[in-house]
Amino acid sequence: MKILKGLIVFICVLNQSCTGQPSQKINGVSFVASNDAIDVSHIHPVINVHANYAAIMPFGFIRNLEHPELSFNSERQWFGERKEGVRQYVETFREANIQLMIKPQIWVWHGEFTGHIKMQTEADWKTLETSYAKFILEYAALAQELQVELFCIGTELESFVENRPDYWNDLILEVRKIYKGKLTYAANWNEFEHTPFWDKLDFIGIDAYFPVSHSKTPTVEECLVGWEKHKPSIQNLSREYNKSVLFTEFGYRSVDYSGKVPWESDRQKGLVNLEAQNNTTKALFEMFWEEEWFVGGFVWKWFVNHNHVGGENNTMFTPQNKPVEQIIKQYYKK
């Protein structure tokens, strides 16, 4: 019996603590689906930035915020958004020894915010629940088959969660029957404090688009001060549930005022400001990456064709081919 106990402790030390905290930070990228299969050459830039995790994101589509049925695994979708693409992406990342999270997401036509999905009748709620469960359980089964380390049961679905808490508790139980890895949910930055089922998951997942500065070009110090109004509530929730926090998404656009409304993704808004992106990103790393209760995160977002995306004239989130890529590389290397 002593030998067995010693072996269990040894395995826990090698892989992660027995409470579920990995021994190494999750230094992840949110890998955007494309319309083609990938190969190891597409993963070399991920390796070069010292990432050890990638989030693979299949999509389900919904007509509008009150429509109850999801469409997914359709031939009209891009390859990487479908089940066959997810499988191929996971298998290719595995060849490069990158660990994975499968993170199914919903896209509402015209880009409306998923947090506002809300049905108007009980019948429509039931239809949505059935449709969403089919979506999630199919990818949970794939995650189990492929031995994926992390699975995310939903992303920024505040109204759905708020209105149907019993459904979500039941869904987690159903996922647990299929998938034996670690579970999280990606709560929006202003949603996580009242997400009701953290006790049933392994990590508290937050899409970390917290406002931290009103300046055109915020300094690192200013952003650190801005984080002080948010960090205590994040840490307190971690203590309350005895769960590590995972930033299921984090990142900033390379625009003026990048720390003011970091969730905004309108291509028409903002002038290029690489320094603003650098400083907001540095502050996030300095504020969280050394905390024991913080497990890591996935930078938003990383595209397949590295040499043809991002760059110093790009105002969007991707860090690729911008100075901030080197900052991420520096912190991910630690």
Predicted regions located by residue number:
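The substrate-binding groove and active-site-proximal loops of carbohydrate-active enzymes
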Residues: G28-A33, E69-K83, T121-S131, G154-E162, ...
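Sec-dependent N-terminal signal peptides
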Residues: L4-L14
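Active-site clefts of carbohydrate-active enzymes
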Residues: S159, A208-V220, L237-N278, W300-T315
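Aromatic-rich peripheral "rim/lid" segments of glycoside hydrolase catalytic domains that contact
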Residues: P262, D266, N278-T281, M287, ...
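Aromatic- and acid-rich polysaccharide-binding/catalytic face
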Residues: I136-T155, A187-V225, S244, T248, ...
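Aromatic-lined carbohydrate-recognition surfaces of secreted/lumenal glycan-active proteins
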Residues: I102-I106, C152-V161, N169-E193, N242-F250, ...
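Substrate-binding cleft and catalytic face of glycoside hydrolase catalytic domains
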Residues: N52-P68, K83-V161, Y257, W300-N305
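Boundary/entry segment of secreted carbohydrate-active catalytic domains
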Residues: T19-N48
